[in-house]
C-alpha cells in the first residue's frame, strides 16, 4: 500500500478499458466483403444452426459476423455493412450484419421490428 507522500508524487494509474469492437476503429459501422458463409452451433443450453459470415473489413480485419433474421442471400464476395453487437451464445462472434443495406437484402413480409431487418412497410388495405 502506498504512503500518502507516494500518492501525492505519482498518483494512481487508471485502468485501461478494453475495446470490445476494436476491428471497427471507433466507427459505428464498417463495410466488408464476405469470405465465407457458414453455420455454427451455439453454446450449451441452446441448440440451433446460427448463420454467420467471415468478413474482411475495409481496414483488413477478418471478423465473424452474425446474419440476423430468417433466410438470407449472402454468398462469397458479397458486400455487407457491419455493426457492433455480440451474439451471446456464439463465442467469438462480436458483430452483426445490417439487413437491407448493400448486398444483404431485408426480410420480405416482416411486420414487427421491421427497422432491424430492413423490411418494407406493408401495404395497408
UniProtKB/Swiss-Prot annotation:
Gene Ontology MF annotations: structural constituent of ribosome
Keywords: Mitochondrion, Ribonucleoprotein, Ribosomal protein
Pfam families: Ribosom_S12_S23
Subcellular location as annotated: Mitochondrion
Biological process (GO), any one: translation
SUPFAM superfamilies referenced in this protein's UniProt entry, alphabetically: Nucleic acid-binding proteins (SSF50249)
Record GO cellular component, one term: mitochondrion
PANTHER family per the UniProt record, alphabetical: 30S RIBOSOMAL PROTEIN S12 FAMILY MEMBER
Protein task: Protein S12 is involved in the translation initiation step.
Assigned protein family: Belongs to the universal ribosomal protein uS12 family.
Protein name (record): Small ribosomal subunit protein uS12m
Organism name: Helianthus annuus (Common sunflower)
Gene for this chain: RPS12
